[in-house]
């Protein structure tokens, strides 16, 4: 069975289904006119979650128990009333964007990452939230800063499938953080990374690194892939140490990365042009794939737009299904493409969607 595809866009959430001929059609459209920044699917109870950004009216969170046919509003993650600012005279922190959602170890458990860089925890299917103060009060957090946004944010939350209390976080710009005990304690990873946008004497500082996205192989969880602001990296020890990969065609800049769910040597990236243009390199849209652990890369573009293309794929805009062969990419121009052969070829699923922020297979 082909899993539904959740498409978060600037004008709401679309739930798409594919038929046997791989033709995609919209089954549900929710939150029309409202940006949907992130979605989550919990396979244990088949619940969908959607994070919204209402602008003036703030961040909202919704849950669906019927595969997107209807939704109920939940309390969104928020700092406790009276929570102090980082510095006297500064405003108290408040959540401006819900940037990541991930099921936890126990039934009904959820993790949420936000801008500013805060981690929140729920044990009741999102009905209530607790700020993970252990991370917020880490001394190194004061070194974090914004990249594409004014404030830092947590965009990647990767529980270890062997023990989902073990967490790996990606923070832009704040590096990678690991917890062995569901957020009670933290250590910073990232040896081997370099931040070329920093002064030379600070380029190896772990707390100022800018991971654009992290992806973990579920079948071999120590293998983690990283699309960094300053290149593409691989970790073989769960995110503590990293090796920079060379020889990528077009560009080693981009935002999105996906890991094969079973094969630790396969990963996909979507190259772009850094920093000001934020468009496909040389106007050529493609997907970069490695099948040998990053020793070599191939550029895949059959079925994607020819040059000049201006389709940028955001960090949550690349998704892989559990079979490791079905993929989808969505762009800032509202284009959606699907592949059934591991990215070797692509087929246009929809060309008229609003700008796409996130994709996820509900499987």
Enumerate the predicted regions with their spans.
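Extracellular glycan-interacting surfaces
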Residues: 1-363
